[in-house]
Amino acid sequence: MAAKDVVFGDSARSKMVEGVNILANAVKVTLGPKGRNVVLERSFGGPTVTKDGVSVAKEIELKDKLQNMGAQMVKEVASKTSDNAGDGTTTATVLAQSIVREGMKYVASGMNPMDLKRGIDKAVAAAVEELKKISKPCTTNKEIAQVGSISANSDSSIGDRIAEAMDKVGKEGVITVEDGKSLADELDVVEGMQFDRGYLSPYFINNPDKQVAVLDNPFVLLHDKKVSNIRDLLPVLEQVAKAGRPLLIIAEDVEGEALATLVVNNIRGILKTVAVKAPGFGDRRKAMLEDIAILTGGQVIAEETGLTLEKATLAELGQAKRIEVGKENTTIIDGAGEAASIEARVKQVRAQIEEATSDYDREKLQERVAKLAGGVAVIKVGAATEVEMKEKKARVEDALHATRAAVEEGIVAGGGVALIRARTAIAGLTGANADQNAGIKIVLRAMEEPLRQIVTNGGEEASVVVAAVAAGKGNYGYNAATGEYVDMVEAGVVDPTKVTRTALQNAASVAGLLLTTDAAVAELPKEDAPMPGGMPGGMGGMGMDM
């Protein structure tokens, strides 16, 4: 095991604070509408230009081990805030830096770090309650667009795209972001449930122009096993033919004689059918078949439920208004399932999301909720160059997370104003002793820091603006984009409550840990091994002359 360097007290803390400051100073220049860009070097390809706080934070690794510890702790603030709320990473970093900076002064003057932390925690809890009180719900398209625009660094076109997508697929719908092929942003919406399996034979196509099979008002047969024997299918096919409606078969696979017979019937116009494989694999396949059954008001023909293909009746088949089957995708539009059953299924899947441990599982479950609840929208980001595309895509993703957070917990005035207003809840607080009161004071000072930084990045005098905003009431604040004092909500400068709350809580949590640190253990830098000796010189007089 390598030897370690153990550093105590002020020496450890001051080194870690240096690391905090290096990281925070690099991140905070991106804050606000007039924030600057940061250029990140890449080991291959061109550099990346970004205004995203967490992207900058993730790139920073410092040579000095103790400085790096401090930087990594603040990096944790940014990434945790990004994971929970999807935005607010720069605000969280600015808050953490301020709490650490002010707190260190008090620790150096001999105050008890534990009491300081208790005071900080008390103040943050009161501020969070106040933020929840002043929060207002975010329901209209206009408000959603405003949140998206602010989060995408005041790019209103991105906000409008996200609001349009949410309007089309609902608040629960899945919205994904992809690279576009043109200069303009595009929005593709898939209504109904879509899964990534296409027709098993091109002979099922009945719309040659679009190369798809379209079934109007069809029955849907769901089976969890392979179908290879046509005899198993005959009874149900006869019932469907009598009803004079088309049929979609979703099974593990349809092959051999069964597939050939379906194709022949289709070509001759006796019975319009399409066969597709069931989506997903293993347990996920069973769950998705069950989802389709609930959406279409049918049942999965499976041994577990005591149903067999030979005895299947029309009552066990699902129904839909329209189904489109392409080469790679199947879309079920307007399934005949009961709203109450679908709602119950959505609740059940949501409960599984809460318990999911891996990001992959959570993502797949969220997709299932969206497919049951309404649809999928894809925002295709357009840009002139690849570098711009990457930067813009990151902003769209940020904005998307922020709008979700806004719909979830509501919105507050943006531009650092909400934190200034939440200070009123802390102003009257007192701790159990003078050290706790100092902790409360630290948070009071830190909560004006985001506004200070926004103003500084805009090239104005921070103290004057902070005093003017603090003297105002409600949503009165400073719009750094225009340099005017306005009602922030009316001007469309709003932040999701969840983002502001999460930033403050995470910043206080990590800053409190730093303040209460009294020793740091780091690996000693490896000493370079001395150069190996050269070859000895030859001895004189050893020539080989004969």
UniProtKB/Swiss-Prot annotation:
Its EC number is 5.6.1.7. ATP binds at residues 30-33, 51, 87-91, 415, 479-481, 495. Forms a cylinder of 14 subunits composed of two heptameric rings stacked back-to-back. Interacts with the co-chaperonin GroES. GO terms for molecular function: ATP binding; ATP-dependent protein folding chaperone; isomerase activity; unfolded protein binding. Together with its co-chaperonin GroES, plays an essential role in assisting protein folding. The GroEL-GroES system forms a nano-cage that allows encapsulation of the non-native substrate proteins and provides a physical environment optimized to promote and accelerate protein folding. Residues 526-546 are annotated as: Disordered. Coiled coil: none annotated. This is Chaperonin GroEL.
